[in-house]
Amino acid sequence: MASLVAGIDEVGRGCIAGPVIAAAVIFAPGQDTHGLADSKRLRPDRRLVLAGRICSESLAWAVGRAEVSEIDQLNILRATHLAMCRAVAALPVLPDWVRVDGNRYPPLDCPGEAIVGGDASVAEIAAASILAKVFRDREMEVLDRLCPGYALGVHKGYPTRLHIDRLASRGASFFHRRSFAPVRAVIDRSSAS
């Protein structure tokens, strides 16, 4: 019997707002994975098409997350690993082996490996990167509608010039990571006033 391999990737580590989202994907052995690529290399419309295909054609997929409060409490690496563990735990079948994009393997209960650049070389990881990106981008777009003024739908929580300017003029909101330097600086300035 062929082994089941899960790929895991995350989106949102470098953001100053919103959760970190991880996805885990398992393909059936021998399944066609043509067209998958690192989510950062794909246009948003192509990511959406591929995400639909991944959800409908993969053997299993799941998404895990770590909230802003967990990121601030644990640190971003531990919170990322927590999101990855939650994604694997949510899979309807357990993998025999896990491949994670990056240089550190999370504390999973199954064996595996960390692969630097895995989102560009391993189909399961590429698929996970696509799902994580689509899920997180959608969440940030919803948050943008609920809390207008920060342009979250544009920068998705990354520390762009636009985001930093809006953060400075509006102050930090509940979705900002207070343990991250740009957010902390805004909070410190407003406390000093």
UniProtKB/Swiss-Prot annotation:
Its cofactor is Mn(2+); Mg(2+). It comes from Methylococcus capsulatus (strain ATCC 33009 / NCIMB 11132 / Bath). Manganese or magnesium. Binds 1 divalent metal ion per monomer in the absence of substrate. May bind a second metal ion after substrate binding. Its EC number is 3.1.26.4. One of its GO terms (molecular function) is RNA binding. Its main location: cytoplasm. One of its GO terms (cellular component) is cytoplasm. HAMAP family: RNase_HII_B. Belongs to the RNase HII family. This is Ribonuclease HII. GO terms for biological process: DNA replication, removal of RNA primer; mismatch repair. It catalyses: Endonucleolytic cleavage to 5'-phosphomonoester. Endonuclease that specifically degrades the RNA of RNA-DNA hybrids. SUPFAM superfamilies: Ribonuclease H-like. It comes from the Bacteria. Transmembrane segments: none annotated. Keywords: Cytoplasm, Endonuclease, Hydrolase, Manganese, Metal-binding, Nuclease. A divalent metal cation binds at D9, E10, D101. NCBIfam families: PRK00015.1-3. Residues 3-192 form the RNase H type-2 domain. InterPro entries: RNase_HII, RNase_HII/HIII, RNase_HII/HIII_dom, RNaseH-like_sf, RNaseH_sf.
